[in-house]
Amino acid sequence: MKPLTPRQQQVFDLIKSKIEDTGMPPTRAEIARELGFRSANAAEEHLKALARKQAIEIIPGASRGIRILLEDAANDDQGLPLIGQVAAGEPILAQEHVESHYQVDPAMFKPKADFLLRVNGESMKDIGIMDGDLLAVHKTQDVRDGQVVVARVDDDVTVKRLERKGSTVLLHAENEEFSPIQVDLTSQHLTIEGLAVGIIRNTDWM
């Protein structure tokens, strides 16, 4: 998570406090009222700034659609978080998705890894990404064509090789038995969750 301004830290701390006390994040109006903002729009601007700094993720269309992301996950003494099943509509680094932590140095990957994702299936086996492997992922949306990415298409998370063609994105498997996933950006929602930076073989932890 990038450093926050004092005001942004106030908003972030309020969100955490509300979730801990009530189980729900605050609405924009509640943030504005408790922190003395002139309007809910002012609260929204601070939320957008927090989202840009990867402190939170905003879920569109919900008055309480705020999720706190892992704080400095890759620097945590617990190790790299292993992300399990990702619930529809929720950010991949939401706390509830963390199955466990592995004592792996993030700096052994270039760029450094922020989290691990368990590979499900054999669509990328031809480049050595096997079912059950732990995929090391650098959280970024700055990716190039030809790179292997973790992508969310609507509510499904997948690992594929990226190719952009205008308003269409092709997500290619590395297994001839799998056809490319074609994403029409005019009607479908695509989010790049990160860049694949390495593999930990599933037998390494047995």
UniProtKB/Swiss-Prot annotation:
Class of this enzyme: hydrolase
Molecular function terms, GO-annotated: DNA binding; serine-type endopeptidase activity
Function field: Represses a number of genes involved in the response to DNA damage (SOS response), including recA and lexA. In the presence of single-stranded DNA, RecA interacts with LexA causing an autocatalytic cleavage which disrupts the DNA-binding part of LexA, leading to derepression of the SOS regulon and eventually DNA repair.
A Pfam family that the UniProt record links to this protein: Peptidase_S24
HAMAP family documented for this protein: LexA (MF_00015)
Residues the record marks as active site: S123 (for autocatalytic cleavage activity), K160 (for autocatalytic cleavage activity)
Residue ranges: DNA binding: 28-48
Lineage: Bacteria, Pseudomonadati, Pseudomonadota, Gammaproteobacteria, Vibrionales
Alphabetical list of InterPro entries matching this protein: LexA, LexA-like, LexA/Signal_pep-like_sf, LexA_DNA-bd_dom, LexA_repressor, Peptidase_S24_LexA, Peptidase_S24_S26A/B/C, WH-like_DNA-bd_sf
Keyword list, A-Z: Autocatalytic cleavage, DNA damage, DNA repair, DNA replication, DNA-binding, Hydrolase, Repressor, SOS response, Transcription, Transcription regulation
PANTHER family the UniProt entry points to: LEXA REPRESSOR, LEXA REPRESSOR-RELATED
The reaction(s) this protein catalyses: Hydrolysis of Ala-|-Gly bond in repressor LexA
Entry similarity comment: Belongs to the peptidase S24 family.
NCBIfam families for the chain: lexA
CDD domains: S24_LexA-like
EC number, as in UniProt: 3.4.21.88
GO biological process: DNA repair; DNA replication; negative regulation of DNA-templated transcription; proteolysis; SOS response
Name recorded for this polypeptide: LexA repressor
Quaternary structure, from the entry: Homodimer.
Keyword set includes Transcription: yes
Taxonomy, superkingdom: Bacteria
Site (Cleavage) residue list: A88, G89
